[in-house]
């Protein structure tokens, strides 16, 4: 699968603490290998999935037709669902 990042995701990744970066990278690699791994979201985020890299959430979508995984954002639980 091709991995793409939104501008928001790239911006958020730059603000994550150094101790959380390895966890997030591992989760993103696992998403790339198996995009259906995450939990489907509801409401305004319907069509997207989340994967927890505690204490962060990786919000992403994937298109099986184009074989693309799009990392939408990475943020802490209290903030990620407000965007």
Language-model features: where?
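Generic N-terminal leader/processing signal
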Residues: 10, 25, 46-48
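A short, surface-exposed loop/turn module that caps and links secondary-structure elements
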Residues: 29-52
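Enriched for short, Lys/Arg-rich terminal
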Residues: 2-7, 11-22, 53-56, 61-83
